[in-house]
C-alpha cells in the first residue's frame, strides 16, 4: 500500500517528535517543517532532529522578516491587545505557520498537514481554520488531540520508539516565543493566586534588577511603519529584536493575564512583550498627533474587531481583509518620531513630532501668540447645544402644564 505524505509543523519538542513516529504507524511519510520566527532556537539542530526521528524530509525556513512585516506590523498598527492586555504573541504566528504548511504540502504533493496542538487550546482552531481557508481539500491531522495520552504514556511511547527525550522535559512551563514576545503557562502559573516565579521570565528583568536611571529611545515611523531607533535604520525584524533588548532591560512588557479562551475556558498566562508594548504605545501617540478626530475616534472600534478576529483564528477571513484595508488607509500620514522613556517597567512617551502634525501651537496656546477666534465660540456653542436646549424647553413646558 502506497504511503501518503503529510507535512508536520515541527518544533523539536516531545509532542511533535512523537507525532513523527505515530504518523509513520498510520502509513504516512512525514515532511517536517520548522519555521524561524525569532524564538532563538538552534533550528539547524531541530531540522536534523526531525530527520533522525524519522521524517523523510525536513525544511527550516527563516520567516522573521515576513512575520514582522505581514503580521506583527498589522498588530502594532491596530493596537491589538486582547481583553486590553495581551498583544497576540502566539495568535499572530499561527496563520503564518498554517500558510507555510499549505505551501509546502502543495509543493510536495502531500494530501495532509499536521500540527501538535492539544484539544483544549486556541491554537488548534487557529491552525485548522486558517488551513481550511487556504486549501479546503487538505486533510488536517492533530496527533496529540487524537492519541489522548497522559504525559507518562507519551514518554513511555517515546522510549519504546527511540525518540529523544528533551533535557528540559521536567520544566513545569509551556512556552511559546517569537519576535513579538513570549508566552508562558502551566505549572504554578495555573494557580491564579500564585505569584509567577522569576524563572518564568526570560526577556525582561525584574523591577528590582532594572537600572535606576531611565533610558530614552527615539522611534522613527514612516507611514505607520517603525523604521529607526535613535536615528539608526533597521529592517523591521531587527528593530523589534533591538527594542526587545532595550525595553526588556527596563522590565517593560511583563503581563500577567487571566484570559477568556476561544474554547470556553479561562486560562492564566504570563507574557513578555517589551518591544510590542513599547511600539504600540509610541505608535498610538503618533496617531494622536496626525489623525483627524473622526478617524481617531472611529479606529478603536475597528481595532477591537481586528483583535478578536486574529485571536479567534480568522486571519484569512474576508472581514479581516476588509478591515485591514481601512487600517492601511489610516497610516498614510503616521510619519514622525516619538521619544520614549524606559524606566522601571514603564514605556512613557515624553515627546512626539511629525511633518503631518495636526497640532497647531498658535491655536492651542494661551499666550499672546494665540490665533484662535474666541468670538466664533459663541455661535458654535449656540448651535451645538441647540438640540439639548430645545429638548429641555419642551419637557419643562409639559411639567409646568
From Swiss-Prot:
InterPro entries to which the protein is assigned, alphabetical: Arginosuc_syn_C (IPR048268), Arginosuc_syn_N (IPR048267), Arginosuc_synth (IPR001518), Arginosuc_synth_CS (IPR018223), Arginosuc_synth_type_1_subfam (IPR023434), AS_cat/multimer_dom_body (IPR024074), Rossmann-like_a/b/a_fold (IPR014729)
Listed EC numbers: 6.3.4.5
UniProt-annotated location(s): Cytoplasm
Main location per the UniProt record: cytoplasm
Residues the entry annotates as binding L-citrulline: 86, 122, 126, 174, 183, 259, 271
Keywords noted in UniProt: Amino-acid biosynthesis, Arginine biosynthesis, ATP-binding, Cytoplasm, Ligase, Nucleotide-binding
Subunit structure: Homotetramer.
Pathway: Amino-acid biosynthesis; L-arginine biosynthesis; L-arginine from L-ornithine and carbamoyl phosphate: step 2/3
Coiled coil: none
Enzymatic class: ligase
GO biological process: argininosuccinate metabolic process; L-arginine biosynthetic process; urea cycle
Listed name of the protein: Argininosuccinate synthase
Family: Belongs to the argininosuccinate synthase family. Type 1 subfamily.
Gene Ontology CC terms: cytoplasm
GO MF: argininosuccinate synthase activity; ATP binding
Catalytic activity, as annotated: L-citrulline + L-aspartate + ATP = 2-(N(omega)-L-arginino)succinate + AMP + diphosphate + H(+)
Binding positions for ATP per the UniProt entry: 9-17, 116
Residues reported in the UniProt entry to bind L-aspartate: 118, 122-123
